[in-house]
């Protein structure tokens, strides 16, 4: 079995931390057991940190983010390849009249550039991205 790298997007990270759903946790455990890598983009990490820094957020949120991030294999750094893929995605989707949010485009671009399977429970948005390998672990 070839080893995969699963990139979790911000929505699925928030869902996991907030709801702790058995089905998703089971898929995470299975991926780890099969020695697949579990990563997030630096973009997702930034979004989680920003959410935790919100003055209205409970101090527990920062602790949850810290605990979650510690269990990941990596936070992938934003690099030129990710920027180039993101630019391609945004250009293509704008031309088609089906743009997605800037952060979602950046996460999708990063997943494509890094050869990752993007795990999200926001498939409606990401399904517009040509060539992306998506999985929704909530299904």
Regions found by a protein language model. Give the residues of each.
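C-terminal structural segments of small proteins and small subunits
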Residues: 121-125
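Residues at the C-termini of beta-strands that transition into short coil/loop
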Residues: 42, 79, 138
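Phosphate-coordinating loops and pocket residues in cytosolic domains that bind phosphorylated ligands
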Residues: 18, 50, 128
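Active-site neighborhoods of divalent-metal-dependent phosphate/nucleic-acid chemistry enzymes
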Residues: 2-4, 74-119
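Generic structural signal for small/hydrophobic residues in well-ordered secondary structure
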Residues: 9-10, 48, 86, 111, ...
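Short, well-structured N-terminal submotif of metal-dependent ribonuclease cores
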Residues: 1-40, 53-67
């Amino acid at each position: 079995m070839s080893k995969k790298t699963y990139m979790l997007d911000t929505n699925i990270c928030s869902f996991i931390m907030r709801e702790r759903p058995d089905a998703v946790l089971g898929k995470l455990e299975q991926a780890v057991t099969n020695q697949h890598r579990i990563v997030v983009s630096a973009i997702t990490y930034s979004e989680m940190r920003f959410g935790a820094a919100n003055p209205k957020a409970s101090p527990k949120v920062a602790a949850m983010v810290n605990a979650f991030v510690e269990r990941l294999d990596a936070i992938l750094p934003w690099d030129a390849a990710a920027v180039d893929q993101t630019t391609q995605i945004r250009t293509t989707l704008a031309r088609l009249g089906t743009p997605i949010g800037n952060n979602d485009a950046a996460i999708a671009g990063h997943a494509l550039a890094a050869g990752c399977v993007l795990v999200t429970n926001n498939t409606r948005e990401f399904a517009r991205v040509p060539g992306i390998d998506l999985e929704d672990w909530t299904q």
